[in-house]
Amino acid sequence: MNDNLFVSLDRLLLEFVFQYEQDISIKEDTIQRINKCLESIKENKANVSKLREAINKVDEDIAFHYKHSKEIKDSCSNWKPTCDVFHKHEDYIKDQLTAYQETNEKDKKMYHDYICQYEDVLKQYQLKYSETRFSCKYYEKKKEHEEIKNRVLACTEQLQLNETILMKFLVPAPFPSLTKWTLYVVNLRYRTQDILKRANNFTKRSFELEKEADDMEIEINSLNKMARLFESKTFSEALDEKNKNTEKRKEFEERIFEKDEQVSNRSSQNSQLLLPCESQKFVRNMNSSEARVTDKKEESSANQSKFVRSDVRQKENNPQIFNDSGMDSNSKSSHIPAVKSSQGFMQFRLNQPNYNQRIEKEHIDAECGDKETVRQVRESKCSTQALYIEHFGKSIENNSVEEERDENFPQTPETPSFLRTPEALKTPESMEKMQFPKSPFFEITKNATSEGHKQKDSPGFSFLMSYTSRSPGLNLFDSSVSDSEISSDQFNEHYSAVNLNPSSSQQGIGNLFGKSEGEDAFTFSFSSDSSHTFGAGKDDFSFPFSFEQDPSTMTSSSSKDFSSSQNKTQFMFF
């Protein structure tokens, strides 16, 4: 029994606990709902207050508009009788307007009828008047008056045209006479020619400046390379190499003097000068260039030194030409003037102060390993001459110790360097690879070497090959100061016309200053004998000739290469 009671009590307690928990959850839910309802009530109260305010504003507006409507009704009731009066007055005015329009139309019809009647009467009167004698006279005079009026108008127009023409003639003419007009035209032509000359000079000057800028860039690059080269060497090694080079140079000069004496003895039999045919224009350009030597000494000396260096290369090329032409018996006699001219060239080259420095530079290029493009050094201006060495398009300035290439000098004194054929020049392919500066001498040597197997060399060609730009007497073919008027193409055209046959040796001098097309003929006389001999590398052969000098070269002509100031010039060959 007790157990059942305890069990039932436990059940009741559990039910009470469960029900208590349910009541607590329900109470919490009701509290949350009450809070939500309170919040909604607050919101509704706020909305109600806003609505009341809006209703109050609307009531105020309604009261204002009601008052305004009452005022409008009162004013309408007050203005209604006046409006009725205005309507009545409007109706009255409209009735009057219609009455006036009807009367105007009636008057128009009446007046139109009157006008038609008056026109008919006028026509009747005109007919009657035209039949009278006075009317006929009147019409005749009227026609005459109209004709006179038309004539006057035409005359006035013609007078206006004449006045305009006369005003044109009254303006003073720019040229009162034919002579003044011709003078003006000539002056204009002279000015245009002067302007064209100046433009040409400016273009030449700009081209020269561009060329100098390129040369300076090349020199700067080469100087940087030389500076790096000299940094790698010690001063003691440079002194030893310079001493060796001076000894070799002395031996080389002794061999050259011995060879020159032998050649002078053999060449005494052939005193006839053989020169290539050259045009008169080339000689005149030389004459104008000689006057510029005194004005531009630095530029001319620099350009001449270029040809001095290039002639050394030409001397090395001469043996190949001699070997190619050695098969012909007629061309053998042409070697003697070439050797004689090379003798004078070498004697002059020994007097050059900067000749040794060029030889020393070649060994430096060999040590640098630049075998494909050999660069030559541009000498410093410590001496009076500024020597530019252009070989394969590059120049280098050298103020310090320079070395010499051993390959350029033979170890035996039998053959000098200008008669020895280097290994690099034995084939025509190597000649084509070499890049000489663009000048008439280099163009001639290049064309001559390429055509060495087809035709024989003439004494005139050998003369050009051995020519030096700084020789004491001959400055005829000096293209370094020829004012850049004789280009390499023109020189080749003149040279291609030369007969390179040794049998025409006597015609070489006569054709030296041959008359070209469109040029004036020179007047020159020869004072040479067949008994002239060559002595000590210098020939007594000379010939004076006279020609007209340009007015620009008359004032600036130099007495260095010309012996007479009366348009007489005597050239000393060799």
Swiss-Prot record:
Keyword presence, Signal: no
Keyword Phosphoprotein attached: yes
Observed effect of gene inactivation: Mice develop normally but males and females are sterile due to defects in chromosome synapsis at meiotic prophase I. Spermatogenesis proceeds normally up to prophase I until a massive apoptosis of spermatocytes takes place at stage IV. Ovaries of female mice at 4 months of age display a lack of oocytes.
Entry GO terms, CC: central element; chromosome
UniProt keyword terms in alphabetical order: Chromosome, Developmental protein, Differentiation, DNA recombination, Meiosis, Phosphoprotein, Spermatogenesis
Quaternary structure note: Interacts with SYCE1. Interacts with proteasome subunit PSMA8; to participate in meiosis progression during spermatogenesis.
Region (Disordered): 259-313, 549-574
Superkingdom as given in the UniProt entry: Eukaryota
Tissue and organ distribution: Most abundantly expressed in testis. Also expressed in retina and skeletal muscle.
Protein name in the entry: Protein SIX6OS1
Subcellular location field: Chromosome
Modified residues (Phosphoserine): 430
Function statement: Meiotic protein that localizes to the central element of the synaptonemal complex and is required for chromosome synapsis during meiotic recombination. Required for the appropriate processing of intermediate recombination nodules before crossover formation.
Residue(s) carrying Phosphothreonine: 427
GO annotation terms (biological process): homologous chromosome pairing at meiosis; meiotic cell cycle; meiotic DNA double-strand break processing involved in reciprocal meiotic recombination; oogenesis; regulation of DNA-binding transcription factor activity; spermatogenesis; synaptonemal complex assembly
Positions of transmembrane segments: none
Biased composition (Low complexity): 264-275, 552-565
